[in-house]
Amino acid sequence: MASLTDLVNLDLSDCTDKIIAEYIWVGGSGIDLRSKARTVKGPITDPSQLPKWNYDGSSTGQAPGEDSEVILYPQAIFKDPFRKGNNILVMCDCYTPQGEPIPSNKRYKAATVFSHPDVAAEVPWYGIEQEYTLLQKDLSWPLGWPVGGYPGPQGPYYCAAGADKAFGRDVVDAHYKACLYAGINISGINGEVMPGQWEFQVGPSVGISAGDEIWVARYILERITEMAGIVLSLDPKPIKGDWNGAGAHTNYSTKSMREAGGYEVIKEAIEKLGRRHREHIAAYGEGNERRLTGRHETADINTFKWGVANRGASIRVGRDTEKEGKGYFEDRRPASNMDPYVVTGMIADTTILWKGN
């Protein structure tokens, strides 16, 4: 008799041309992820081959009960690391039945920015460092921390190994491999300064694909922590006191920045970002004021400053970029719970399209 595990891992490829497509979308809070699956004829190689779908928006905080239908538009596809085979994960955005983007659809505006000829010509690259915290289920307390107590002070945990310093590595490595399998351009992982906190990096990714890849990487991480009985937190300051917060540092460059003379373009872009500091901060994640205090490798939320190799700055420029006179810079302001569509689109808009008026 087949076990549950046998059935979960059942390979359908030799008995049907149908596949399972898991449609994923961002829920009403702007940070929660929802998904549901449907059967389609495979193989699917492009999202345009997939049908639109709908869901009950009144149950996700995205539509009233008397007119609850929200339409899913498939936008990007990835291999499904859970069902494997030809099965796929589908990143969608959300519209009214009349074809208007709903308020929580932040992808639509970002796609408009990235499709602008001036932005497309600059081929914007993003590398996003997604920090997160693993929590003990039912306790809302970091993994590896004594119940009701605290571990030793920060210092031994960053990029560390050992049962007393690294907590949750099996989840981290499972996520790393699952993202590679899915086709996400995940570029690395590391343990963070606060115990129980980790980071993965996605990129370089071009334009709108950076947001798609971060959202699907988050979805995969949610599924893996679900399987492990661990809770994923993207709170930018999960523990009060002398503990690091969690951010989503966003590395960015344009074609002009990557070419000879690019350092001057970088400085001009940073100057523009400084002039729109308040607008960016307002869009860079909920609760970020608890993280951006001027301590724990952050700049104060009300102050904009940049520097070379300065992790206490709003914008950090690397030593190699300064030396070579071209390259990229890092926006250190985004919180771990930021919407990558908002952040990437806003950076491109400010640095390329905005004329500074």
Swiss-Prot record:
Pfam families, A to Z: Gln-synt_C, Gln-synt_N
Q: Where in the cell is it found?
A: Cytoplasm
Which organs or tissues contain this protein? Answer: Found mainly in the cortical tissues of seedling roots, stem and seedling shoot.
| Gene Ontology MF terms in the entry | ATP binding; glutamine synthetase activity
Does this UniProt record's set of keywords contain ATP-binding?
yes
Q: Which residues form a coiled coil?
A: none
Instruction: Tell me the protein family, please.
Output: Belongs to the glutamine synthetase family.
Under the subunit heading, UniProt states:
Homooctamer.
What is the protein name stated in its UniProt record? Glutamine synthetase root isozyme 5
UniProt organism field:
Zea mays
Lineage, broadest ranks:
Eukaryota, Viridiplantae, Streptophyta, Embryophyta, Tracheophyta
Gene (name only): GS1-5
